[in-house]
Regions:
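Active-site- and interface-proximal helix/loop "cap" or "latch" segments in soluble metabolic
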Residues: 16-33, 38-115
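Short, compositionally biased leader-like segments
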Residues: 1-14
Length: 115
């Protein structure tokens, strides 16, 4: 049976990419999107706008299944360990923005646009 859609929420974060890398020529900023199960506080899906499929897949696979219960730092440390590309700082910044949005939503600080 599929999970009820209401417990899954999508969060996005954006950060400026460094100059001199392909992703900057394509996008200027990195977009990172995570789909979170709000009951388990676990990342179900992740995607980002890096230039290569390998990098996008690696970042996604690294984040999927990770918990948000302990704040952003465990995820930041994980990315810092497993991603040694030039966009690391931008990925981490975008990840922290995603977490800030998640925390605000969880605390009820982000009202729906229809309210």
């Amino acid at each position: 049976m599929p999970k009820p859609i209401g417990r899954r929420v999508l969060f996005s974060g954006y950060a400026k990419l460094p100059t001199g890398i392909t992703a900057t020529e394509l996008y200027r900023v990195i977009g990172l999107v995570i789909l979170v199960d709000m009951e388990t506080e676990t990342i179900l899906e992740a995607d980002c706008t890096l230039a290569t499929q390998v990098a996008r897949k690696h970042v996604a696979e690294t984040l999927i299944g990770q918990s948000l219960k302990n704040g952003p730092e465990p995820l930041v440390r994980l990315i810092d360990q497993v991603y040694q590309g030039s966009a690391k700082k931008a990925i981490i910044t975008a990840l922290r923005i995603c977490f800030d949005k998640y925390r605000s939503f969880k605390e009820g600080a982000l009202p729906a646009m229809l309210d």
